[in-house]
Regions:
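Enriched for short, Lys/Arg-rich terminal
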Residues: 58-106
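A short acidic, often aromatic-flanked loop/helix-cap motif at beta-alpha or helix-coil junctions
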Residues: 11-18, 50-51, 68, 90
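Positively charged, low-complexity intrinsically disordered regions
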Residues: 27, 46, 91-92
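An acidic, glycine-rich, mixed-charge low-complexity segment common to nucleic-acid enzymes
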Residues: 1-9, 43-48, 57, 77, ...
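Helix-centric, low-specificity signal for extended rod-like, repetitive segments
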Residues: 19-21, 52, 62, 83
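Arg/Lys-rich, positively charged N-terminal/basic patches that mediate binding to nucleic acids
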Residues: 1-34, 106
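A short, surface-exposed loop/turn module that caps and links secondary-structure elements
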Residues: 34-63
Length: 106
């Protein structure tokens, strides 16, 4: 079936700080991932790998945080958000994500 907001979970390490700081993010991010899924992730770009799974990334607008960029993986109708940051420039975001994941891309 289609992925919906209820199928979106958050990995503690890369999300907790942002979710605590900006209360509306949990709902906004889950809704954004659902919307992206309905569009076939057309607006998402690749962003490396996490635990052997391909990551996608996109921007999410939030009332509390302004804009954030997220990285998430999708598998079997479920999504896991791995990282949330206010770093919006894609190149800088990827560098920051690489550092977070602890694996440099050549």
């Amino acid at each position: 079936g289609a992925l919906n907001a209820a199928d979106v979970s958050f990995d503690k390490r890369g999300c907790d700080k942002a979710l605590r700081r900006w209360p509306d993010l949990r709902v906004r991010v889950a809704a954004a991932v659902e919307t992206q899924a309905q569009a076939g992730f057309f607006h998402c770009k690749g962003a490396g790998r996490w635990r052997g799974r391909a990551l996608k990334e996109c921007r999410v607008n939030s009332r509390d945080a302004g804009s954030v960029r997220i990285a998430f993986s999708v598998e079997g109708g479920r999504a896991t958000v791995v990282y949330i940051t206010q770093t919006l420039v894609r190149r800088d975001f990827l560098r920051e994500l690489d550092r977070f994941l602890g694996e440099a891309r050549p």
